[in-house]
């Protein structure tokens, strides 16, 4: 569980540390707001409300399933600044499929914690392999990191792309290429 009081105290200390008047009307309730926000954006640190990636057994579909351009946000664990973008998730079933909303739900759960994009990408692919036992999967995540956009090197709009490739997507260049072409295809 989250310790809301400890979060509020910490935020108050940070505000004092940067020279803010913690009793100023616009700032006074900020520690409470931040504590509530942390409970929401870090929900993935708690056990999931439901079983992730509930599968439907006995399906005979054995061709690629791809959901692309799934928007997400997360928080970089190094600077506690957001990173956000789109995920693309492909898998080839082996007797099990999931309802299409299950993949974005899994992404949302795993992204709601202090995180790095590389780990998020791998965690999603590993979860897919563990729960669905598909012939293979591929996860590609494209994201902008505010820790690069608004501080440090200050390069807004720079995108970081990570991938995790498992099973047949790793073994077969043709399968991997098909997924990449579908991900990169833009409807006119």
From Swiss-Prot:
Signal sequence annotation: none
Sequence positions that bind Zn(2+): 76, 79, 147
PROSITE patterns for this protein: GTP_CYCLOHYDROL_1_1, GTP_CYCLOHYDROL_1_2
Catalytic activity: GTP + H2O = 7,8-dihydroneopterin 3'-triphosphate + formate + H(+)
Listed GO MF terms: GTP binding; GTP cyclohydrolase I activity; zinc ion binding
Pathway listed: Cofactor biosynthesis; 7,8-dihydroneopterin triphosphate biosynthesis; 7,8-dihydroneopterin triphosphate from GTP: step 1/1
Pfam hit, one: GTP_cyclohydroI
GO CC, alphabetical: cytoplasm
The entry's keywords: GTP-binding, Hydrolase, Metal-binding, Nucleotide-binding, One-carbon metabolism, Zinc
Alphabetized InterPro entries for the sequence: GTP-CH-I_C/QueF, GTP-CH-I_N, GTP_CycHdrlase_I, GTP_CycHdrlase_I_CS, GTP_CycHdrlase_I_dom
EC number: 3.5.4.16
GO biological process: one-carbon metabolic process; tetrahydrobiopterin biosynthetic process; tetrahydrofolate biosynthetic process
PANTHER family cross-referenced by the UniProt entry: GTP CYCLOHYDROLASE 1, GTP CYCLOHYDROLASE I
HAMAP family: FolE
Subunit structure: Homomer.
Family label: Belongs to the GTP cyclohydrolase I family.
NCBIfam families (UniProt xref): folE, PRK09347.1-2, PRK09347.1-3
Protein known as: GTP cyclohydrolase 1
Source organism phylogeny: Bacteria, Pseudomonadati, Nitrospirota, Thermodesulfovibrionia, Thermodesulfovibrionales
Gene: folE
């Amino acid at each position: 569980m989250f310790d809301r009081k400890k979060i509020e105290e910490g935020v108050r200390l940070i505000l004092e540390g940067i020279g803010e008047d913690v009793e100023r009307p616009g700032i006074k309730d900020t520690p409470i707001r931040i504590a509530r926000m942390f409970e929401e954006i870090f929900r993935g640190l708690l056990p999931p409300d439901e079983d992730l990636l509930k599968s439907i057994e006995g399906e005979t579909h054995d061709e690629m399933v791809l959901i692309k351009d799934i928007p997400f946000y997360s928080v970089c664990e190094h600077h506690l600044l957001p990173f956000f973008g789109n995920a693309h998730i492909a898998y080839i079933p082996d007797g099990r499929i999931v309802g299409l909303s299950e993949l974005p739900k899994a992404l949302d759960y795993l992204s709601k914690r202090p995180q790095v994009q590389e780990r998020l990408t791998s965690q999603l692919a590993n979860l897919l392999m563990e729960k669905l036992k598909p012939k293979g999967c591929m996860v590609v995540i494209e994201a902008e990191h505010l820790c690069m956009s608004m501080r440090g090197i200050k390069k807004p709009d720079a995108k970081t792309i990570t991938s995790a490739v498992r099973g047949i997507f790793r073994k077969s260049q043709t399968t991997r290429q098909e997924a990449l072409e579908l991900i990169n295809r833009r409807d006119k």
